[in-house]
Regions:
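Short, solvent-exposed secondary-structure capping/transition elements
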Residues: 123, 127, 178-182, 256
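N-terminal acidic, proline/glycine-rich, low-complexity intrinsically disordered segments
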Residues: 2-5, 16
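Short acidic, low-complexity intrinsically disordered linear motifs used
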Residues: 11-27
Length: 287
């Protein structure tokens, strides 16, 4: 019996020692801090979205071929007067007829990217709990106009916006090696700059962003977003070539509703049939 008591007492002592050890470990862990898995969501429906895409080599090569054809055409249409910078600009019309290996045309590829931009902007306007409501929306896109910008050393484009469209784009096909800026602390030469609506005194947002373009960079942005292009210097006669286009979009369901309303209005405005008119009119041309 005495031996049994000793065994039980020894067991209790061990259990108490283990409990104290566990308590000390818990206190130590609490002192270090506890890691939690939390769910976070950034909500910014009021922000203009600037999307940057890296174009596949096949699209870059296709666009170079298309723009070479246009720039070498002596009968090309010069749109230079339509731009504030008066740079050489040309109408772009060959994308629809240039097919790519993945299927479809260069035009369809670019408009699909535009569609993805619209989709992401739509998601940004909704909180996560409403994503299911907007995920099924189908968008129709339309390219309003397209042009080439062929710039050389010293040429630039001052701050401007695009009109008569909802969004704009720019893709870079040729980018020369720029010489170092005359102000190393401000390496802006050759940059494209976007100017948003962020407050200049805000420490949590920026109202200006600059990017030194590389071949294949493709930007999509709201047409009202101000932007400009800085001049550049090179050690030779090298071209910076980009292609831009303006686009618009509409919810497919809304478009179909508009078409239906237009048809109804046309039917209502059509003149009523003449009462008592003969089914067949015979014209006698005999003298």
């Amino acid at each position: 019996m005495e031996n049994l008591k000793n065994v039980i007492s020894q067991g209790l002592i061990m259990n108490r020692a283990q409990r104290r050890q566990q308590q000390r470990a818990e206190k130590k862990a609490h002192a270090k801090g506890t890691n939690y898995s939390i769910d976070m969501e950034m909500i910014q429906p009021w922000s203009d979205v600037l999307m940057k895409v890296k174009l596949p080599d096949e699209i870059i090569d296709a666009m170079l071929e298309i723009t070479d054809t246009i720039l070498q055409d002596p009968d090309r249409k010069n749109w230079g007067d339509n731009l504030i910078a008066y740079v050489p600009v040309f109408r772009l019309e060959l994308m629809q007829n240039h097919n790519i290996a993945q299927g479809g045309s260069v035009f369809e590829f670019l408009m699909n990217v535009v569609g993805e931009y619209i989709k992401q902007c739509t998601f940004q306007q909704a909180t996560r709990q409403d994503h299911d409501k907007v995920a099924g929306i189908q968008w129709l896109t339309q390219m309003k106009s397209a042009w080439i910008v062929s710039q050389w050393e010293g040429e630039y484009n001052p701050i401007h916006i695009h009109t008569e469209c909802s969004l704009s784009t720019v893709m870079y096909l040729k980018v020369p090696e720029f010489l170092p800026s005359t102000k190393p602390e401000r390496d802006d030469d050759g940059c494209i700059m976007f100017i948003g609506a962020g407050h200049q005194n805000s420490r949590l947002t920026r109202n200006i962003i600059k990017h030194k373009p590389k071949v294949g960079d493709f930007f999509i942005f709201p047409a009202h977003l101000q932007h400009c292009v800085y001049p550049f210097k090179t050690d030779g006669d090298f071209e910076r070539r980009s292609v831009s286009f303006n686009a618009d979009f509409i919810n497919k369901a809304e478009w179909e509703k508009q078409q239906q309303m237009m048809q109804q209005q046309q039917q209502q405005q059509a003149p009523p049939p003449v009462q008592g008119a003969p089914e067949k009119l015979t014209i006698n041309t005999a003298a």
